[in-house]
């Protein structure tokens, strides 16, 4: 373990945040620590608590000029079985291999520390910078995400706040820091389908209507359907059935209904309405008695090459020597809410190989490099 006095400012703050067990939606005073640091260098602070979720909005600078926002979350997922960890999950230990170990090291307290330290340095080096540096931080990203970034964005919209560029600190890198940035995400549309039949005795199938038999051809057609071709930025839309339930548990009873849970991860080539209409047409084609409940988690968004992506890519190249690869793969993030403000959004953070796993860890030295990347991006856009 590296002695605390030997740690960089970024690593000291990262360790402090990791040691706070902020399992979603609990913040465990992580945001207080961040706000104290930002307030000390002149940021205007606005805590925003919605229901049981802590959020804050912080700004430095003037309304004139563009706004660059750092966004992220202080909440982490549960640890899982603590006895399976090599070290205590909230110990924030740097091991003999130079790995910073602990829940949230990658997702995403390391990024938060880098954002704060980079911003402290930037506003001290450029006190009269153009535009604004902003922070949008929540403790509700790993949970339902109803009262976090989504709620803050709704408030900012109501106040006609401007947000030109946003860097989300999600762990975007795959093998080496900065090798991948996310410049968009697919949309996520979930559904619970209920197909009704008629319960009966398996020995008298003519007196029953088996919903499993009825639904199987329709589900097979949905699974085989080619929804779109994708485009230069997105792969084709995917359809996956995640749960299928029917039956009473008895071997001699034809069930009365079937439920299926499925999800679309969809590109900008498809729309919510279009997907819903095509699903309905296939179900009707098979003459099913059905009902469906839809749940939209987020629309697809895309940041095409431009000022933000150029600044981030150039900063990664200057600090690491690497050419970054923009990607829209993976799950959803809070970037989907921020993008609704017309904001260019890029996700850039540590290597994601161990996120949500036992023994989550990242290379400790990567956080100092990430701080420099964030700092250089600030300089390129707002100095």
Swiss-Prot record:
Please indicate if the UniProt record lists Iron as a keyword: no
Family of this protein: Belongs to the peptidase M20A family. DapE subfamily.
List its EC numbers. Answer: 3.5.1.18
State the organism of origin.
Pseudomonas entomophila (strain L48)
Q: Which residues form the active site?
A: 75, 141
Q: Which GO terms describe its biological process?
A: diaminopimelate biosynthetic process; L-arginine biosynthetic process; lysine biosynthetic process via diaminopimelate
Question: Has the keyword Signal been applied to this entry?
Answer: no
- The protein here is known as Succinyl-diaminopimelate desuccinylase
Quaternary structure, per UniProt, is:
Homodimer.
Q: Which HAMAP family match?
A: DapE
GO MF annotations in UniProt? acetylornithine deacetylase activity; cobalt ion binding; succinyl-diaminopimelate desuccinylase activity; zinc ion binding
